[in-house]
Design a protein with these regions (language model features):
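N-terminal glycine/threonine-rich, aromatic-flanked beta-hairpin/loop signature
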Residues: 40-87, 101
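Extended Gly/Ser/Thr-rich low-complexity repeat segments
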Residues: 88-95
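N-terminal helix-cap/turn-to-beta initiation motif at the start of protein domains
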Residues: 24-39, 50-56
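Edge beta-strand at a domain terminus
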Residues: 23-26, 74, 102-123
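Bacterial N-terminal signal peptides that target proteins for export
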Residues: 1-10
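Hydrophobic h-region of N-terminal signal peptides that target proteins for export
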Residues: 12-21
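Conserved glycine-centered beta-strand/turn positions repeated across beta-sheet architectures
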Residues: 36, 97-98
Length: 123
């Protein structure tokens, strides 16, 4: 009888831990939190440019080839530009940053530069 009570107690504790773990996971950022205009660093000195992320997945920028597409991946917005560059905008502590990846690299490679990113205007 004691074995049955111990097994039931262990199962109850495991079930409670599993339920607690599922409810305490952070939810991914909604795409709406990234839609809008972003002022980001170019990665050269203090130069900046603007990235615009639209609700339909279209992305434009004020530097280089202006066209691209973006999607959410976890908690970051990933942008693939027609010129081969890739950018990721993500929360880093209490601010946002833009990580840039040169043509031929993927988002799993180390970025070529990381600069600040500030949303200047929601759409």
């Amino acid at each position: 009888m004691i074995r049955i009570v111990i097994k039931a107690s262990v199962l109850a504790v495991l079930a409670a831990c599993l339920a607690l773990g599922q409810t305490s996971k952070p939810s991914p950022k909604p795409a709406a939190s990234f839609v809008g205009q972003w002022k980001v660093g170019l990665g050269i000195g203090s130069e900046t440019f603007t990235i615009t992320l639209e609700k339909d997945g279209k992305a434009t920028k004020s530097h280089g080839d202006p066209n691209g597409k973006w999607t959410m991946f976890g908690d970051e917005a990933r942008i693939s530009w027609d010129d081969g560059w890739h950018d990721a905008i993500r929360k880093a502590g209490n601010h946002y940053e833009k990580a840039a990846y040169a043509p031929g690299k993927s988002f799993t490679d180390p970025p070529d530069n990381i600069t600040g990113a500030t949303r200047t205007e929601p759409l």
